[in-house]
Amino acid sequence: MISFNNNYRKLRKAIINEDIEEIKYIIEKDPNMIVKVDNNNHTLLHIAIMYRKVNAVKVLLDKGDNLVYVINSFPILPPLYCAIIGFCKLTRRNKISNALEKINNHKKIIEALVDKGVELTGLEIALSCKNIWLIKFLIEKGISVEYTGFFPVGVNYNTIDIDICKVLLENKIDINKPVCGETLVRYAIRSSDLNLLKYLISKGADIEKRNKYEQDPNIIEAVEKGNLGIVEYLIDNGISIDTVSIYNHKPAIYYAILAGHYNMVDLLLRRGANPFITCEGNTSLISVATQAKRNRLKLINLLLKYGVRLPGDHDYYIQPILLDYSYETYNIIHILLEHGLRITSNTTLVSTFLIIRV
């Protein structure tokens, strides 16, 4: 960090005014000025980028032998990021005076930075803004498409559409490799874009591909999103319906039941999901249904229809609903008792008796 001395102020002013001779003169007098960082973690190069001063950027890059090292050091925002953010903001606005000139200046600055050898970054911003020129430029220059970005915010997956995927595939990006941390199929699932999913599968996408160390299976992601069309299409194309979560080793049907998504559970069961998985306390999925956000009674009846019973610790089936004195709870308790529920805990027995009496 620096305290603003007279030379720094003069150089900053010269950059904003794009007074090239003055910039060169001050740098020659004090070469170290060029790599100093202000209280906002900005170098003078950042200032030149923010004011879109193309010639000033080029002079600073030419004069600063150590500048690339400094600007790629955390916590300083990489100047390429700074330029890309400004560029994308401009292209998303409709009414700006001299917009075309400003956009072109940003392009020239981005090109100058890349030519100087700064670390390639910002693809996730380009994708989130659907900026075709920038996506193509970064890929052509050799950016690692798997890199998730400077900030842990990821891509706005709703912007990944067929047009964006066509650009990526035309630029020789492997359809099954992660792009900014996610496969293209994963983006289609997360955005519930059935047309995109169909397009990707037609181009040879593997519907099972994902980051196995950090992400749940695609079928679980799709079920949690709740789009029946997406889930059914994945099943039609051979996705494994019973692949379990990396976090709790439960399959998609478990999550569908917990969310109370009756139609999703019905679809999964009709398409061959295993209803006989073991849950906490060696219980069945019926214990999960008693904890569902909605449709508890319907889900229990559906599971019973498929032959699911009440094994394991029977207190697990009843405990989640003991504080819910609703008519649905009354019916749930009755149907569980009819199908062999045995309550062994005195506390649970008393609470159940009170609900039935009410």
Swiss-Prot record:
Pfam families: Ank_2 (PF12796), Ank_4 (PF13637). Keywords: ANK repeat, Repeat. SUPFAM superfamilies: Ankyrin repeat. PROSITE patterns: ANK_REP_REGION (PS50297), ANK_REPEAT (PS50088). This is Putative ankyrin repeat protein FPV242. ANK repeats lie at residues 6-35, 40-69, 91-118, 119-147, 149-177, 180-209, 214-243, 248-277, 280-312, 316-345. It comes from the Viruses. The keyword Translocase does not apply.
